[in-house]
C-alpha cells in the first residue's frame, strides 16, 4: 500500500469507529431513558435490570408501518424511544382513532397481549419510530426470574388502565375543544406530526369542526 492508501484506510477506520461509538452512545442513552421510566414505576436493582435489558430488542420502523393488525395476536410490549404511534379501529367510512402514544411511553395491544387472543384494533406508526421490544414469552421469563418483574408488570398494567379510563372520562365529560387542548398541552411539538383527520377522529369531531376549534384558540 502507498502512503496515500494508508491515509485513506486510516480515515476509513476512524470514521467507522466514530459511527460505532455514536451508535453505542445513542443506544446507551435510550436504554437509560427506559430504565428511568421503569424506575419511576418501581426501582429495579442492577441484577434484575441487566436480565430484563438482555431480553430487549431494538427495532426501527418507517412511517405508516402497521405494528398490529386486526385479527392478529399482539406478541410484544414495546417502549417508544422515538416516534408517534396511533391506535385505531378501521371502519368502512371513517377510521376511529382512540389513542396516540409518544416517546417514553409503552405501546401494546394489551388485551390481546395478555389474553393471547386476536386484536380488535390496529396500531401503526405515524412517524419513523424506534422501539425497544420484549416478547410475551421473554416477559414471562422476566416475571419468573426477577424479584421486581411481577410488581413492575402490575404497575404497568395499572398505568395502562388509568390511561384508558382517562380517555373514557374525557369523552364523557369534556368538550371536543377541551380534549384538543389536553392533547395539545401534552405534546405540542409532536402533535404537529399527526394528520388533522386523526386528531379530529380522536376528539370525536369532523375535520371541519376541528378547523373551527383551531381557529378559535389561535
Feature annotation, model-predicted:
Residues 15-18, 174-218:
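Phosphate-/nucleic-acid-contacting segments
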Residues 16-57:
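Cyclic nucleotide-binding regulatory module and flanking cytosolic helices
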Residues 57, 84-88, 106, 130-131:
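Short beta-strand segments in beta-sandwich/barrel cores
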Residues 67-72:
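Short phosphate-coordinating micro-motif centered on Lys-Gly-acidic
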Residues 75, 79-85:
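Glycine- and acidic-residue-biased ligand/ion/polar-headgroup-sensing regions
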Residues 96-155:
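Cyclic-nucleotide recognition modules
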Residues 144-146, 164, 186-191:
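Basic, amphipathic alpha-helical hairpins
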Amino acid at each position: 500500500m502507498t502512503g496515500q492508501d494508508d491515509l485513506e484506510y486510516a480515515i476509513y477506520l476512524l470514521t467507522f469507529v466514530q459511527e460505532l461509538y455514536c451508535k453505542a452512545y445513542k443506544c446507551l442513552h435510550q436504554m437509560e431513558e427506559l430504565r428511568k421510566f421503569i424506575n419511576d414505576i418501581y426501582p429495579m436493582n442492577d441484577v434484575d435490570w441487566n436480565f430484563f435489558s438482555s431480553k430487549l430488542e431494538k427495532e426501527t420502523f418507517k412511517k405508516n408501518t402497521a405494528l398490529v393488525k386486526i385479527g392478529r395476536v399482539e406478541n410484544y410490549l414495546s417502549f417508544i424511544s422515538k416516534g408517534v404511534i396511533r391506535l385505531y379501529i378501521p371502519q368502512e367510512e371513517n377510521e376511529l382513532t382512540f389513542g396516540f402514544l409518544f416517546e417514553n411511553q409503552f405501546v401494546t395491544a394489551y388485551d390481546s397481549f395478555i389474553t393471547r387472543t386476536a386484536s380488535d384494533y390496529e396500531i401503526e406508526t405515524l412517524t419513523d419510530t424506534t422501539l425497544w421490544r420484549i416478547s410475551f414469552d421473554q416477559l414471562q421469563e422476566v416475571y419468573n426470574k426477577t424479584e421486581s418483574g411481577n410488581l413492575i408488570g402490575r404497575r404497568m398494567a395499572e398505568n395502562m388502565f388509568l390511561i384508558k379510563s382517562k380517555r373514557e372520562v374525557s369523552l364523557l365529560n369534556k368538550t371536543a375543544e377541551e380534549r384538543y387542548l389536553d392533547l395539545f398541552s401534552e405534546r405540542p411539538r409532536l402533535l404537529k406530526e399527526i394528520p388533522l383527520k386523526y386528531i379530529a377522529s380522536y376528539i370525536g369531531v369532523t375535520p371541519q369542526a376541528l378547523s373551527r376549534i383551531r381557529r378559535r384558540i389561535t
